[in-house]
Amino acid sequence: MQTYPTGVAAKATGTPLTTLQRYLQRSHITLQPCDVPSRGCGENRGYSQRRIIQIALTTELARLGIGPSRAAKAAFEFSDKGNTGRPVGELYPLGQTLLVGLPDGKSVVINIPPDKSISDVLSNDSAAFICDCGYVVAKVLSNLSKS
């Protein structure tokens, strides 16, 4: 699996390096088996595409006023967990893929089919925040293709 150095990850996500380092130091973002940790002998840390997307979603949610701990946990629901019809770290093939933060602190990834509205899918549930994963993923993939 391809990984990217810290500078590329920061640039692709629009996350300042100091903010990215803070996410890691405070364990908001933790490296997973698909990432490459630094061995401390001058080797760079390697971020997988999934981790870069988690960082980008975390940064986007932080811009919306969500705290980094909750933002990173919510982003992990998209980047590292799949749903029926959606592989891990990928968008639903049709419609919109939304990351929804619920008032109880949990987060879910939902699909809004092309013929439905968000109110049809959320029904009586209320949301603390909603983030369009498609927008964030497209931005990250475009930036990574330029690196």
Residue ranges and their predicted role:
Residues 49-80:
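A short, Lys/Arg-enriched interface patch at domain edges and termini
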Residues 32-58:
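Short helix-start
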Residues 1-26:
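Polyanion-binding surface elements
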Residues 76, 81-147:
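Low-complexity intrinsically disordered segments
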Residues 22-36:
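Short alpha-helical DNA-recognition segment
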